[in-house]
UniProtKB/Swiss-Prot annotation:
Record SUPFAM superfamilies: alpha/beta-Hydrolases
Listed name of the protein: Carboxypeptidase Y homolog A
Molecular-function GO term, any one: serine-type carboxypeptidase activity
Source organism of the structure: Chaetomium globosum (strain ATCC 6205 / CBS 148.51 / DSM 1962 / NBRC 6347 / NRRL 1970) (Soil fungus)
Gene name in the database record: CPYA
One GO term of the biological process aspect: proteolysis
């Protein structure tokens, strides 16, 4: 399994130690923002398509103001890195299979028309689906023993663009005819959601002998769950092309869900929720907005949940220094000099992020990502502490601090497992660092996707939960952006009473919760970046209570 110690698995910046690892990383919005985000790779080639060999060559035609922003990067990235630039993920070896139980043609679904109550005809479901197909394999539970419930796996195909997204569905252990459906997304960007399946909240985990171990607190105890490897070239997904921004990924997810619920209408009538962590703080506002934008849809979206997410960088990056310096509920990791240095760097960082927010331009957003990650995450990371859990050191740098990732990768690379799931690629990787880099260099990292949340709140509830021991997407920053968000319910939300979170019958609380209208924030005690891994029973408790509408607007 190819993993670089400096790269973030679940959603922190791969540029956190950019100064030390720049060459390795480089080689190895909507509306105005969407228009401005042209591929930065275009700027690193001349008119004939040949790569430039230095910053001077690439940026000689820029204005003085733009050059000044990029001078920050010039100090961090060696010229030699430009000689090996590659902007497309290398396609994995793969072979197409033909042993599928179902194949759903997007063109057929798009061609279905219905009449409304007034006799007017319209498409049964909206969206451009003609280029998509969904392939479905009924997984034999006895082959893998991950769970005994009904399971499906397969691929969403975008044949025109050679994109193939892998998914794995687990039916609810309880009452699948009535229980809700959840789509789970890990972050990265570029990390497999099968990480969430086996390391956090799925029906089983993998031990060091590659044995499957049952999880009594799986999120499919009372809900059916879809785990999706997205964007393409992540996990078991593959493509000859690439996706390098969140908005493009949203189109694929809408198509997947539409075709899946068309094939399985018994699940389409259930409540549907999107949940994820880390960079899913970017994904989920965009994916939810994409779904809600379609009036005629078969996706019964009822809420979204974001755990330890990166959603509003301008607000969240201010809270790295307090978390590292003893103000987040845990002892300080950094000394006074380093804390002062982070304080000194913050105004420049916020200025760069604000420029990104206002322009949406890749030329503003990339410098913001690199400078801020180096200044705000780099000092902490250089201590050797776990960026996902402030309570201890990074114990397995070859697996991004968690040996369990290695076990999962070894398990999923077994041919018997791949055959049982209908996998078409030759290998599984937990994270694709080309994707991580491409999102960074498309300016996606600092895009203000939190601005989509107020519109979402008009239609469905939103839960932001955060393990309070995480550094990389810490609870201080997540609480801060929820309180800073401009929406009609802001005043009431900020004034809402903070209540204890407790298991039924327990005396001691496991966290705090604040809710008003459709907005809820939770702090979960003694949990790092991956709350379901660190607090499995407690996370299942708040999930079930959320699905039952405990904190929804009445």
């Amino acid at each position: 399994m190819r993993i670089a110690a400096s790269t973030v698995l679940f959603g922190a910046a791969s540029a956190a130690s950019f100064q030390q690892q720049a060459q390795h990383v480089l080689s190895g919005g909507f509306g105005k923002a969407q228009e401005a985000m042209k591929p930065i790779s275009d700027a690193f080639t001349d008119a004939a398509g040949r790569p430039f060999e230095s910053f001077e060559d690439a940026f000689s035609g820029m204005t003085a103001e733009t050059k000044a922003l990029w001078e920050e990067i010039k100090l961090l990235v060696p010229d030699s890195a430009f000689k090996d630039l590659s902007w497309l993920s290398k396609p994995k070896p793969h072979h197409r299979r033909d042993d599928w139980n179902h194949v759903v043609k997007g063109a057929d679904v798009q061609g279905m028309w219905v009449q409304d109550a007034n006799g007017k005809s319209h498409r049964q479901v909206d969206g451009r689906l003609e280029e998509y197909n969904l392939r479905v394999k009924a997984v034999d539970p006895s082959k893998l023993n991950v769970d005994s419930v009904k399971q499906y796996s397969g691929y969403l195909d975008d044949e025109a663009n050679d994109k193939h997204l892998f998914y794995w569905f687990f039916e609810s252990r309880n009452d699948p005819k009535n229980d809700p459906v959840i789509l789970w997304l890990n972050g990265g960007p570029g990390c497999s959601s099968l990480t969430g399946l086996f390391l956090e909240l799925g029906p089983s985990s993998i031990d060091k002998t590659l044995k499957v171990v049952n999880n009594d607190f799986s999120w499919n105890n009372n809900a059916s769950v879809i785990f999706l490897d997205q964007p393409v070239n992540v996990g078991y997904s593959y493509s000859g092309s690439s996706v390098s921004n969140t908005v493009a990924a949203g189109k694929d997810v809408y198509a997947l869900l539409t075709l899946f619920f068309h094939q399985f209408p018994e699940y389409a009538k259930q409540d549907f929720h999107i949940a994820g962590e880390s960079y899913a703080g970017h994904y989920i506002p965009v994916f939810a907005s994409e779904i809600l934008a379609h009036k005629n849809r078969n996706i019964n979206l009822k809420s979204v949940l974001i755990g330890n997410g990166l959603t509003d960088g301008l607000t969240q990056y201010e809270h790295y220094r307090p978390m590292a310096c003893g103000e987040g509920g845990y002892p300080a990791v950094l000394g006074e000099a380093e804390c002062r240095s982070m304080d000194n760097a913050l105004p420049r960082c916020q200025s760069l992020i604000n420029n990104c927010y206002e322009s949406g331009s890749v030329w503003s957003c990339v410098p913001a990502s690199i400078y801020c990650n180096n200044a705000m995450i780099g000092p902490y990371q250089r201590t050797g502490r776990n960026v996902y859990d402030i309570r201890g050191p990074c114990e397995d740098s070859s697996n991004l601090c968690y040996s369990g990732l290695g076990y999962i990768s070894d398990y999923l690379n077994q041919q018997s497992v791949m055959d049982a799931l209908g996998v078409e690629v030759s290998s599984y990787d937990s994270c694709n660092f080309d994707i991580n880099r491409n999102f960074l260099f498309q300016g996606d990292w600092m895009q203000p996707f939190h601005r989509l949340v107020p519109k979402i709140l008009e239609e469905i509830p939103v839960l932001i939960y955060a393990g309070d021991a995480d550094y990389i997407c810490n609870w201080l920053g997540n609480r801060a952006w929820t309180e800073a968000l401009e929406w009609p319910g802001k005043k009431d939300f900020n004034a809402a009473k903070v209540k204890d979170l407790k298991l039924s019958g327990a005396e001691k609380e496991y966290g705090k919760v604040k809710a008003s209208g459709n907005f809820t924030f939770m702090q979960v005690y003694q949990a790092g970046h991956m709350v379901p891994m660190d607090q499995p029973e407690n996370s299942l408790d708040f999930l079930n209570r959320w699905l039952n509408g405990e904190w929804f607007a009445k």
